[in-house]
Amino acid sequence: MLSRKGIIPEEYVLTRLAEDPAEPRYRARERRARFVSKKGNCNVAHKNIREQGRFLQDVFTTLVDLKWTHTLLIFTMSFLCSWLLFAMVWWLIAFAHGDLAPGEGAAVPCVTSIHSFSSAFLFSIEVQVTIGFGGRMVTEECPLAILILIVQNIVGLMINAIMLGCIFMKTAQAHRRAETLIFSKHAVIALRQGRLCFMLRVGDLRKSMIISATIHMQVVRKTTSPEGEVVPLHQVDIPMENGVGGNSIFLVAPLIIHHVIDANSPLYDLAPSDLHHHQDLEIIVILEGVVETTGITTQARTSYLADEILWGQRFVPIVAEEDGRYSVDYSKFGNTVKVPTPLCTARQLDEDRSLLDALTLTSARGPLRKRSVPVAKAKPKFSISPDSLS
């Protein structure tokens, strides 16, 4: 029986049907783990924390950071435990005063209508949540019962205050507002005013504005110091420009934030080939500001890996003037178009400006036009001579 390898050429094997046989085969490089996800979550797992008690020193923040199921479970258990604890206290008071045996006890009980632990538990719930059915009440017979009544009311108010505060903070957290702050899926590198620039687009879907909005950008990459120390997450700040100078932005409409790649930029030696080979590079973008309606500071984050940066492309315009006002077409928010861009690093472009001149000359000529071929006039099938008219 003939083997499959002998009758089927290698370029038509199933494993290579989607490949080009003329190109060499490369081993797929494992993609670098993100430090910040596209949605802004930090991809960090904390392990082997020895001092767990530090979380209990800030109980309120710990409760707010917990999941909803855990938070509601803790408050439910807090109410049940407090009711059971004070029910035991009320039962002990009634037992010590002899109120559990009405025939043999005192004439005036400490708490009326308590004859068992069940009735003591019901009275504990009535006291703490101020239901007030009226069937059970504390009398003047036992000063200790009056003191326990005051303590249970204070404990109930404290639990209610903490619960309401946690629920309010969890529903009004800053990251809820950040859900409507959007970034472009890809970043681009193209020429702007003769310089290579790293650009991205940011927008706000809500009509309520972000006050004092600022934007920051950092490059995170793995580096090695001259002494041989390996820094897995080396963070370098890079300046952003938005047309008005500084990091402050007026985010009333989508903006294109750009960073000029100059000699002080960590992207100065970045080449187009580095983007295709998944270079160990991540650019983190942080947008921060104050919510106009609530006054809470919010922060939106995203990141771009090397393969999410498009070289030689530019964002399409999405803001147009219609009927006396500006309209934004968010369906084109992340759309880009190709533009002439030198395939070299910013360092090479600064050292050899002729690359830019050649690119400008090529773009000035424009695309090749189809050569017009003159069309020969067709000869008439018959002609009229002057002699035939005479």
From Swiss-Prot:
Keywords: ATP-binding, Disulfide bond, Ion channel, Ion transport, Membrane, Metal-binding, Nucleotide-binding, Phosphoprotein, Potassium, Potassium transport, Transmembrane, Transmembrane helix, Transport, Voltage-gated channel
Motif (Selectivity filter): 130-135
Location of Phosphoserine modifications: S385
Pfam family for this entry, one: IRK
Reactions accelerated catalytically: K(+)(in) = K(+)(out)
Residues on Extracellular side: 93-116, 134-142
GO biological process: potassium ion import across plasma membrane; regulation of monoatomic ion transmembrane transport
Disulfide bonds: C110-C142
Principal place of residence: membrane
Post-translational modification: Phosphorylation by MAPK1 results in changes in channel gating that destabilize the closed states and reduce the ATP sensitivity.
UniProt GO MF annotations: ATP binding; ATP-activated inward rectifier potassium channel activity; metal ion binding
UniProt intramembrane stretches: 117-133
UniProt topological domain (Cytoplasmic) ranges: 1-65, 172-390
Modification sites for Phosphothreonine: T341
Subcellular location: Membrane
SUPFAM superfamilies in the cross-refs: E set domains, Voltage-gated potassium channels
Binding site for a 1,2-diacyl-sn-glycero-3-phospho-(1D-myo-inositol-4,5-bisphosphate): R176
Record keyword Transmembrane helix present: yes
Residues holding ATP: N48, R50, Y330
Family of the protein in this entry: Belongs to the inward rectifier-type potassium channel (TC 1.A.2.1) family. KCNJ11 subfamily.
Name by which UniProt lists this protein: ATP-sensitive inward rectifier potassium channel 11
Organism expressing this protein natively: Oryctolagus cuniculus (Rabbit)
Lineage: Eukaryota, Metazoa, Chordata, Craniata, Vertebrata
Gene name in the database record: KCNJ11
